[in-house]
Amino acid sequence: KGYGCPGLSYIAYGLICQELERGDSGVRSFASVQGSLAMYPIWDFGSEEQKNHYLPRMATGELIGCFGLTEPDYGSNPGDMITRAEDKGDHYLLNGAKMWITNGTIADLAVVWAKLDGVIRGFIVEKDDPGFSAPEMTGKHSLKASVTSELVFQDCKIPKDRILPGVKGLKGPFSCLNNARFGISWGAVGAAQSCFNSTKEYALSRIQFGHPIASFQLVQNKLSWMLREITKAQLLAYHLGKKKDDGTWIPEHISLAKMNNVEIGRAH
């Protein structure tokens, strides 16, 4: 809320993710990274100067952000990340690499997590910072509308005022991931709804034995099962959204909703 942002509820955010992914998972992925992984840490952990400088332009889409946590050898174990920041007096030097980064090549800034004196800290890296590059990764089999990149830091010089002052340790990136997973739990429902609508349209238009196959009980049963499971997933996402809005959620709620709903999306 504030800094050019509308301050919508979590349920409203979830519904937006659902409808975006109903159209294309890559579009929802872009929005999740921009809001949950790039804007959120600046809003929650950044200084007032950082918030005022970046958030209004990110809210309008003038600036695109990305999130650098995962490394080639450290995905599920980010606490052992290799990327390091060194305090050089009037600036930091960043060295390392991040992998499979959504929006990386097109981003104007990256929120990067690195170890400074053994403690994980967040840094805002701008695309023109010396020593920073973001080559695009190609040859993907899916999510082709979403840009995926590597982030490379070779003595990347970061001004002192670009460290996020409000958090230390894995709480920072994990807080961001919780918000992104919340959006994914809704987005998966949208993907499943799109599959259901396509299936229903096909069943109504495909003629066998002189009748649409939708008139056969076996097909009706399959469609009913699909709609039942999708509706249950949406109710779970809505319940989670209410808990997010009233502040009674815990991280396990988000993980369980994402686990259930992406399975529904995959199965359909």
Where are these regions (language model features)?
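Alpha-helical interface subdomain recognition
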Residues: K1-V33, F45-Q50, R57-E62, N77-P78, ...
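Helix-loop "lid/cap" segments that line or gate small-molecule binding pockets
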Residues: S36-D44
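Short beta-strand-to-turn element immediately C-terminal to the catalytic PLP-Schiff-base lysine
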Residues: D44-G46, E86, V112-K115, I124-K127, ...
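A short, Trp-centered hydrophobic/proline-enriched beta-strand micro-motif
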Residues: G61-L69
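Active-site-adjacent elements of ketosynthase-type condensing enzymes
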Residues: D73-I82
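Flexible, small-/acidic-enriched active-site or ligand-binding loops
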Residues: D80, D128-K160
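A short core secondary-structure module
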Residues: H91, N95-A134
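Glycine-rich phosphate/pyrophosphate-binding beta-alpha loops
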Residues: M99-T105, S142-L143, N179-G183
